[in-house]
């Protein structure tokens, strides 16, 4: 997969991969907020889902925002 940041596209105001690399956000530049945030991964046993959620996909596509070549958004209309 040739998308940026291990498959996570960070679409900011300049439509490029940012330092956060948290995926395409629903609000502008929220994925680039700096601070002392902590991410917790909880693993357990649950029934298998029969569908894939967009937040779990390697290449996100929200509001027309998806990773293109060379760490850019294609098309560049992230909202």
Curated annotation (Swiss-Prot):
Keyword Metal-binding: yes
Lineage: superkingdom: Eukaryota
TM stretches of this protein: none
Pfam families (UniProt xref): Metallothio_2 (PF01439)
Coiled coil: none
Molecular-function GO term, any one: metal ion binding
UniProt keyword Metal-binding, yes or no: yes
Alphabetical UniProt keywords: Metal-binding, Metal-thiolate cluster
Function: Metallothioneins have a high content of cysteine residues that bind various heavy metals.
Entry's family note: Belongs to the metallothionein superfamily. Type 15 family.
PANTHER family: METALLOTHIONEIN-LIKE PROTEIN 2A, METALLOTHIONEIN-LIKE PROTEIN 2B
Name of the molecule in the record: Metallothionein-like protein type 2
Species of provenance: Malus domestica (Apple)
Name of the gene: MT1
């Amino acid at each position: 997969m040739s998308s940026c940041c291990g498959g996570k596209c960070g679409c900011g105001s300049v439509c490029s991969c940012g330092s956060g690399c948290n995926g395409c956000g629903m609000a502008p530049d929220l994925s680039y907020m700096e601070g002392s945030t902590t991410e917790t991964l909880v693993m357990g046993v649950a029934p298998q889902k029969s569908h894939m959620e967009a937040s779990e996909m390697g290449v996100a596509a929200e509001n027309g925002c998806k990773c293109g070549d060379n760490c850019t958004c294609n098309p560049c209309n992230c909202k």
